[in-house]
Amino acid sequence: MSKILIIEDEAAIRRVLVKILSEENTNYKVSEAEDGLQGIELIKKEDFDLILCDIKMPKMDGIEVLMASKKIKPEIPIVMISGHGDLDTAVNAMRLGAFDYISKPPDLNRLLN
């Protein structure tokens, strides 16, 4: 079973992602964090196969989470999620080591594949 961490400050979006990825037929174990600091604490404690991380968050933004995560566990792929379909942000995230970048609302078919 693959373990996924969702780091998203918007509760409604986080709930939808958790629900979709936790369904019986997906074979994922999903953990969640409501901000970057909480996400980093989970990354330190657990091993994840994938991290889905929002970019615009209070306390610690997604780019900071990406950089910190790459220092702690560089092997975990991180997909950045943002409501701001900004190409510069996407390019910057990829340059810093993000595996991929998707816009909100995420394309569920793309997310599951």
Where are these regions (language model features)?
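Conserved acidic carboxylate
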Residues: 8
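Two-component/phosphorelay signaling modules centered on CheY-like receiver
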Residues: 11-31
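Conserved phosphotransfer cores of two-component systems
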Residues: 24-25, 44-46, 68-75, 96
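Acidic catalytic/metal-coordinating carboxylates
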Residues: 35-38, 61-64
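Receiver (REC) domain active-site loop signature in two-component systems and cognate sites
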Residues: 55-57
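C-terminal output helix
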Residues: 86-88, 102-113
